[in-house]
Amino acid sequence: QINRAAHFCGGRLQTRVANLGTSYSVSIWFWNGMPIDSRPVLGWMFGRGQNYSAQATGEGLGLNAKGQLIFSNEKETLTGKANTERWKWHHAVLVRDQEKVQVYLDGKLEISSEANAVSSVETLFLGGRNNKESSWEGRLDEAAVFDRALSENEVKGLSPR
């Protein structure tokens, strides 16, 4: 069975989601094409913020140089524990419940922390952040945005691993 996925090479998709608020979830299947340790951030697969902002305002979900999931907002960057493999499909879910952030990798909790929420920002990006730095180099598939914080069981149901 053939399953086609969007292949990103420095570009990104932008959309507007009105009234998303500070509780939402994003589910993304990702395939990293960048060599490990090739740059400090291998790529941002999801972002929320004002388009072309000079600073990294807003928030983003991506991979650091080691291939670990990272969540970044205007004040801090949170890092997961597990390394992902290049050229292999993985599933990430970002769960934002106001000031609480959880990030799952292949159904397992990787990041759980408090983080300032982005409010009244309606612009979302796939394949990059609002400032266009370290855009995604690889594939993204079956991305979904939910207007609420998903439960742990719902996240596990999205990731069959």
What is the predicted role of each segment?
Residues 2-70, 86, 96, 100-104, ...:
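Extracellular glycan-recognition modules
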Residues 105-125:
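Short, solvent-exposed beta-strand-to-loop segments that form ligand-recognition rims
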Residues 69-91:
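Short, aromatic/His-centered strand-loop micro-motif at the edge of beta-sheets
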Residues 14-17, 79-84, 113-115:
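Beta-strand-rich interaction surfaces with strong enrichment in secreted/lumenal proteins
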